[in-house]
């Protein structure tokens, strides 16, 4: 049964209402499918390699094929969500993720598994930006901080639980079950979404889809991503890599020109008008490149060099899960009180410290409980503290700096940046650290490469903290009045209200004083899920603008 809610209800949902809780469950579970799959496969790599006879290059492509299609299409996915409906595209993404998951589970060869993973990336490109866009466009402004903080904590926990769940499934059954797990989760998400999530879209997007922009964006991201994968490892001839890079750069240049003149651009130029949006995405790229390297190598290192079982290797990161669950929402609240600059400086520096502590883990460390407590636990505790301090503030900063009506596109851009960063790390880090050939099966060689890799990732993470200190403003997440909201779908857009001086925050409690009380509703009674609006209408969020009438670049 589909929900009776329409776009008219969007933007008025109360977080603690039954509908608000169901919507959060749908977006968290949907996002968890993508986040879980991104981390659970790392634990399965040794088992996959043994079962299908894959070498190091093929195992890297098991990861990279997913990231390649995800990075290439995620911008288009965000644009489709804003244009055709966030609930519709989110649901389609869940379906397109489930079906290839079954193909992954039955893949008899590495080649088929790589293709199936690429198809999974297509589904993830549709559902990933849609989840945050649903939160930003359906909850009332005052409740978005609580919603985004809880979403960040629970999806972070899903990422951290991936290695544990994957390790248990591999030990108890087979690596193939890590993909079958997506089927029941997906069915639950589809049922909840159809019944409880209202539809919303950007009412200002009109006319046909910008097909030329879509093709250029996809070709550009795919070409550059392929070059980033194959360039460092030398898996393809130099001319092939150079051609892919050239085509990618040319396509993105053409995309930039096309979007300036398109009637309904996939990537509205105004999204990049905020310097804080650019800075937040730059910090995202640097920090997530470091995280991608650690998540890729740590569980493999623990299994190969220290003799951990898949379950034990996954459970080794359990403190990260607990810290994410306990501290992510508090990190968002801290960012609201003191500004995001402090947590985005301290968090990456703590991550770097945790990576340096991983240098103490060596082949002779042992795998007993006492050995874990002495060598592994201190590193993952500091690392987890840094992760919990960083994730919610950097996501909130990126989304709060972009216009509210472009929430799907802004989420797509930020997700694309983080995925390309992780992909770059997976491709380049083994080469830079001297890991190649059969080193993933040699305990001593892998340990040497792992230590070199941790030095590189620590330097990257520290650089991200310094970049945040230099470029992120403390008032980015400042509070704001409710943004002007466009009329619901199937109606003519209603006149917009006065542009608010600051965009509404995405995480945490507003720093600035609350706006003046709204005028009473001119008819109608607020329901349990939707408080009274300022004009008696139930409208989807419209543009918060890029600052006030004075043109200042406020968030």
Question: Model-found features: residue ranges?
Answer:
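Intrinsic disorder in cytosolic terminal tails and internal cytosolic loops
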Residues: 1-19, 471-555
